[in-house]
C-alpha cells in the first residue's frame, strides 16, 4: 500500500515537514479554499502540487472535489456545476493527479454527536450516540416525520437525555452535528438546516440513485479522458439519517454503483470505519469482491455499542473491524495487479485517530490529531510488513 496522510493545506497544524517524518510518502488533500461548485484553476492545482513535491512527497489523492447540493437534488444551477466538476477533473488530470475521492451524502458529510469521548486509558475519540442524536432530531431540530421513526422507548430515553443536558452541552451537541466536521465544506444554523432538509422532500433512495447515475454518466467520460480514477466514499454512518436517503452504505450499493456506469475509472474508497459500523458489512468479502475497483482506502476501526446505532472510534487495530483480514485482502489484490502489470499500490491513509499525549492539550481538528494518526499509521505499517512475509 502507498502510505498517505490527510493534509488540510498550508494552515494545517501538521506541516508537510511533519508528514515526511511520519513515514508517509503521499499526501491526501484538496483546495479547500475554493467554494463548492467552482472550477479549480490549473494554476492553483500546480501551486499546491509544487508545494507538496518540494517536500519530496506526492499528491496521491484529492479528497475531495465536493459535489454541490444542486447536483444531488438536480435543481438550480446543477448543470453548470456538473460542467465545472468535469473541468476540475480535466484540470487535475492535466496536472498529473490520478485519483479523486468524493461522496454523494445529502446535506451532511460524516456525522458525530461527541467529539471528545473519553476512553478508559484517558485518550479521546469521536462517538455517535444514537440516543443523543434522537434527542437532537426529535426535540431540538423537531424534524417533521421523525416521531414515526422511533419507538416509544427510544423517544423516552431521548427525552431523559435532553432533560439532563446543561445548556452548554446542548449547544455543543447541535454544533457537533450541524456546524461541519473536517472535510465538510458546509455548516448551518438550525433554521438553515431545517430548510436544507426540506429541500430533499420527495427524494428517496431510488431518486438519489438516479441522480448519482446521471452525474456519473457525465463525469466518468471526463475522468476516462484524463486517466483519472473516481473513488466514491461511503455514507457515514452507513444508514439513512434525518429522513435523508443514503446510497453508498452496503455491498448491494457498491454492486449497483459499478453496474450503473461500468468503467475502469468508476470505483470506490474503502473506508473500513464507515462500512464497518454495520455488522452486515463483511469487509474482507468486500475487498475480495470489489478489489479491482478499490482506488483508495481509509483504514480505521469502530466499536459498536449496546444501544443499537451507537458506536465510537476504536484504535486502528481494535474494535469490530477485522483489520488483519482487510489488510491481507488488500495485499492480495495488490499482488494480482502487479502480476497483471497494472498499477498495484493502493493509496491508504490512517483515518482519524485518538487524541493522545500532548495532542490532548491542542485544539486539533476532530479526528485528525497528529499523534493518534501517526500511531495508527505505524500500527498498520507493522501489520502490513508482517502479513507480506506470509504471502
UniProtKB/Swiss-Prot annotation:
Reactions catalysed according to its record: D-mannonate = 2-dehydro-3-deoxy-D-gluconate + H2O
Pfam families: UxuA
EC number: 4.2.1.8
Obligatory cofactor(s): Fe(2+); Mn(2+)
Pathway assigned to this chain's UniProt record: Carbohydrate metabolism; pentose and glucuronate interconversion
Keyword field contains Manganese: yes
Keywords on record: Iron, Lyase, Manganese
GO molecular-function term, one example from the UniProt record: ferrous iron binding
Annotated GO biological process: D-glucuronate catabolic process
Record-linked Gene3D superfamilies: Divalent-metal-dependent TIM barrel enzymes (3.20.20.150)
Signal sequence residues: none
Classification via InterPro entries: Man_deHydtase (IPR004628), Xyl_isomerase-like_sf (IPR036237)
The protein's role, per its UniProt record: Catalyzes the dehydration of D-mannonate.
Protein family: Belongs to the mannonate dehydratase family.
NCBIfam families: PRK03906.1, uxuA
Protein name: Mannonate dehydratase
Biological source species: Marinomonas sp. (strain MWYL1)
Native organism taxonomy: Bacteria, Pseudomonadati, Pseudomonadota, Gammaproteobacteria, Oceanospirillales
Amino acid at each position: 500500500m502507498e502510505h498517505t496522510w490527510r493534509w488540510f493545506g498550508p494552515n494545517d497544524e501538521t506541516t508537510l515537514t511533519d508528514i515526511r517524518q511520519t513515514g508517509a510518502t503521499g499526501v491526501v488533500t484538496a483546495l479547500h479554499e475554493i467554494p463548492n461548485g467552482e472550477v479549480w484553476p490549473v494554476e492553483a492545482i500546480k501551486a499546491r502540487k509544487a508545494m507538496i513535491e518540494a517536500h519530496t512527497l506526492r499528491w496521491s489523492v484529492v479528497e475531495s472535489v465536493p459535489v454541490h447540493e444542486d447536483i444531488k437534488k438536480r435543481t438550480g444551477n446543477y448543470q453548470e456545476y456538473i460542467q465545472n466538476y468535469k473541468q476540475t477533473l480535466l484540470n487535475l488530470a492535466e496536472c498529473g493527479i490520478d485519483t479523486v475521492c468524493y461522496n454523494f451524502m445529502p446535506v451532511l458529510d460524516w456525522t458525530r454527536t461527541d467529539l471528545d469521548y473519553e476512553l478508559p486509558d484517558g485518550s479521546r475519540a469521536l462517538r455517535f450516540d444514537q440516543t443523543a442524536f434522537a434527542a437532537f432530531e426529535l426535540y431540538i431540530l423537531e424534524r417533521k416525520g421523525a416521531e414515526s421513526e422511533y419507538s416509544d422507548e427510544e423517544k423516552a430515553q431521548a427525552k431523559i437525555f435532553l432533560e439532563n443536558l446543561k445548556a452548554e452541552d446542548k449547544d455543543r451537541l447541535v454544533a457537533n452535528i450541524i456546524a461541519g466536521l473536517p472535510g465538510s465544506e458546509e455548516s448551518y444554523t438550525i433554521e438553515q438546516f431545517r430548510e436544507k432538509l426540506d429541500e430533499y422532500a420527495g427524494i428517496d433512495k431510488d431518486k438519489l440513485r438516479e441522480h448519482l447515475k446521471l452525474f456519473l454518466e457525465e463525469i466518468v467520460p471526463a475522468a476516462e479522458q484524463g486517466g483519472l480514477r473516481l473513488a466514491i466514499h461511503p455514507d457515514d454512518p452507513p444508514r439513512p439519517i434525518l429522513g435523508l436517503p443514503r446510497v453508498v452504505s452496503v455491498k448491494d450499493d457498491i454492486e449497483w454503483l459499478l453496474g450503473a456506469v461500468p468503467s475502469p475509472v468508476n470505483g470506490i474508497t474503502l473506508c473500513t470505519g464507515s462500512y464497518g459500523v454495520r455488522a452486515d458489512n463483511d469487509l474482507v468479502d468486500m475487498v475480495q469482491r470489489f478489489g479491482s475497483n478499490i482506488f483508495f482506502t481509509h483504514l480505521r476501526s469502530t466499536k459498536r455499542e449496546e444501544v443499537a446505532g451507537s458506536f465510537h472510534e476504536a484504535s486502528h487495530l481494535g474494535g469490530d473491524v477485522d483489520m488483519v483480514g482487510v489488510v491481507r485482502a488488500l495485499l492480495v489484490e495488490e499482488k494480482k495487479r502487479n502480476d497483471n502489470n497494472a498499477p498495484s499500490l493502493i493509496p491508504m491513509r490512517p483515518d482519524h485517530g485518538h487524541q493522545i499525549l500532548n495532542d490532548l492539550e491542542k485544539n486539533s481538528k476532530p479526528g485528525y490529531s497528529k499523534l493518534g494518526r501517526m500511531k495508527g499509521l505505524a500500527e498498520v505499517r507493522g501489520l502490513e510488513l508482517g502479513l507480506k512475509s506470509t504471502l
